């Protein structure tokens, strides 16, 4: 955790409700020489279902490999999250650590191994110490119950604030609660999933439908953000549903009120995703990039991400420089259909370039005023079709360099 809270942090912290069927514990296992909780244990009542998405990195952590296999079974009794050590790229020692953790928890709960999920976050290349993890679990088994804010803080690494969200809906006459927490600040460029994010609900829903809902929500949220274009080896998003709300189980998208659950999952994912961008390492500006007029939505998304990932665009925003030429560059390099003489660009709704050149009588003053704010809007019209997309990123500052240059020290 970093001492100074991001200037883009939300002005309020939502009060998250307890969710029936879930017990929360967190302790200091001591993965680093610090006095903070770094092992979190989520316990679920029997028959809790799970869905999940994991990184598309070619170098996934042992935890990711374990979760990928376990998700297919659709059941969960526990989730363990370790902070301070990602356990990625650690060979057989890393796999042994995951095996030891899942075995210890499964033995304690008298459940199947595949019902125990594990995530780890932190430095890459250092095996997770098995004794430290297992000793931490023993402490967690007998620890006092805590609330969601404790858990959100315990999973953090370079984050500057705890990221939480909630939704309350009614499904077929039953009140349903949904809570989400996430950690992430750097190494953020998701592909299918991102960072470590967890969603919890007391809704009764089939795991297959929950998986569909999470996948849809991901496409509109986690897959639309970037901080530094680096996709983590540990990215994981998991959703757990205890069925404690007592609603008739949802098994199809056509079921009554299934659309309400989908909307809630999407809303929480989008809120959490944008909070991650707002906590981008060293960030001082939250940037929304909209692309319209592309040949397809997919093409628009690729172009938008090219702009959002451009170090030149991001540093221009940090310097409050209306250098729209860098946006032109990012569009041109995206590898998607674009026509120079049809392209138009706006900053804060103000057109700065159109038809292949700067607009006549361009006045930079109102654009400069917009760039001095913390919320920046970049809009591009490709002029070729109806494809559209919106993504979110942050600026690139000296703070990002300082945080990552000193990360291991």
UniProtKB/Swiss-Prot annotation:
The protein's UniProt keywords, in alphabetical order, are:
Acyltransferase, Amino-acid biosynthesis, Arginine biosynthesis, Autocatalytic cleavage, Cytoplasm, Multifunctional enzyme, Transferase
Q: Which Pfam families match?
A: ArgJ (PF01960)
Please provide, in alphabetical order, the Gene Ontology terms of the cellular component aspect for this entry: cytoplasm
Q: Where is this site: Involved in the stabilization of negative charge on the oxyanion by the formation of the oxyanion hole?
A: 121-122
The reaction(s) annotated as catalysed by this protein in its Swiss-Prot or TrEMBL entry are: N(2)-acetyl-L-ornithine + L-glutamate = N-acetyl-L-glutamate + L-ornithine; L-glutamate + acetyl-CoA = N-acetyl-L-glutamate + CoA + H(+)
Record-annotated residues binding substrate? 157, 183, 194, 281, 404, 409
According to its UniProt record, in which pathway does this protein act? Amino-acid biosynthesis; L-arginine biosynthesis; L-ornithine and N-acetyl-L-glutamate from L-glutamate and N(2)-acetyl-L-ornithine (cyclic): step 1/1; Amino-acid biosynthesis; L-arginine biosynthesis; N(2)-acetyl-L-ornithine from L-glutamate: step 1/4
Where is the site described as Cleavage found in this chain? 193-194
GO terms (molecular function) for this protein are: glutamate N-acetyltransferase activity; L-glutamate N-acetyltransferase activity
Q: Which InterPro entries match?
A: Arg_biosynth_ArgJ, ArgJ-like_dom_sf, ArgJ_beta_C
Q: Would the keyword Nucleus turn up in this protein's UniProt record?
A: no
Q: What is its EC number?
A: 2.3.1.35, 2.3.1.1
Q: Tell me, which GO biological process terms does this entry list?
A: L-arginine biosynthetic process; ornithine biosynthetic process
The annotated active site, in chain numbering, is 194
Q: Where in the cell is it found?
A: Cytoplasm
The answer, when asked if DNA repair is one of the entry's keywords, is no
Q: Which NCBIfam families match?
A: ArgJ, PRK05388.1
Can you tell me which family this protein belongs to? Belongs to the ArgJ family.
Q: What does this protein do?
A: Catalyzes two activities which are involved in the cyclic version of arginine biosynthesis: the synthesis of N-acetylglutamate from glutamate and acetyl-CoA as the acetyl donor, and of ornithine by transacetylation between N(2)-acetylornithine and glutamate.
Quaternary data: Heterotetramer of two alpha and two beta chains.
Q: What is this protein called?
A: Arginine biosynthesis bifunctional protein ArgJ
